[in-house]
From Swiss-Prot:
Single GO term (MF): structural constituent of ribosome
Keyword tRNA-binding: no
Keywords of the record: Metal-binding, Mitochondrion, Ribonucleoprotein, Ribosomal protein, Transit peptide, Zinc
Amino acids binding Zn(2+): 94, 97, 107, 110
Localization: Mitochondrion
Record family assignment: Belongs to the bacterial ribosomal protein bL32 family.
Subunit text: Component of the mitochondrial large ribosomal subunit (mt-LSU). Mature N.crassa 74S mitochondrial ribosomes consist of a small (37S) and a large (54S) subunit. The 37S small subunit contains a 16S ribosomal RNA (16S mt-rRNA) and 32 different proteins. The 54S large subunit contains a 23S rRNA (23S mt-rRNA) and 42 different proteins. bL32m has a zinc binding site.
Protein name: Large ribosomal subunit protein bL32m
Any one cellular-component term (Gene Ontology): mitochondrial large ribosomal subunit
NCBIfam families noted in UniProt: rpmF_bact
Length: 129
């Protein structure tokens, strides 16, 4: 009986420890060891408290706000500004009259003369574009 009480008093050795079993199962399945670590109390005391941290964030949010409302005129200038115009580099001279014209386009002065000529001489159904 004394042997039984000694065995009952001594801590029983577990054959199955669930925490170590699942940790080894996790490392076998994913190949990544389980991250179980304790943070020392000294490190926790060095961290700033949450209210002071929130105050710092709130101060940054308040400073990010414009001081005055954007005026109607400034909004319109910004919206209606449009994009910068590109320089026209493909210009050449018209072979008939010698005025400047865009490449692969009809000369505006020659086109006006052609339209006037067609209007004076019977106005056929042909149109010059």
């Amino acid at each position: 009986m004394a042997a039984m009480t000694a065995a009952a008093a001594a801590p029983a050795m577990r054959l199955f420890n669930p925490s170590t079993f699942f940790q080894t199962l996790r490392t076998q399945r994913f190949g990544v060891p389980a991250l179980n670590f304790a943070v020392p109390a000294a490190a926790i005391s060095l961290l700033p408290s949450i209210p002071s941290l929130l105050e710092d964030i709130w101060e940054g949010i308040l400073r990010a706000v414009p001081k005055k409302k954007t005026s109607h005129m400034k909004k319109r200038h910004r919206q209606m500004a449009g994009k910068a115009l590109k320089d026209v580099t493909h210009l050449n001279r018209c072979p008939a009259c010698g005025n400047l014209k865009r490449m692969h386009h009809l000369c505006s002065t020659c086109l006006g003369k052609l339209k006037g000529f067609m209007d004076r001489n019977g106005g056929s159904n042909a149109k010059a574009y």
